[in-house]
């Protein structure tokens, strides 16, 4: 069961994430094998910093409904990649206005 995470700056590889973030960048990128579809590459931020994120499943659907500047609720897990880390997102949706404080 996901728990409310700390700020982005406090995340560590292996953490389960249930949080709200701002989308700074969103790009739909085809897999090397085009028959496999695409994944959604995101740059997410909060007041403490930013982190890369990926939506591997149903990426086209997510990309169609999300834009830079949207505040989203995400659920996923922090994973290592090369010299950094990213969030592998399992669920993502736009946050409702009553769910977030824009000061965060």
Question: What annotation goes with each model-predicted range?
Answer:
Residues 1-91:
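Single-stranded nucleic-acid-binding OB-fold domains
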Residues 84-104:
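Extended, charge-rich, solvent-exposed interface segments
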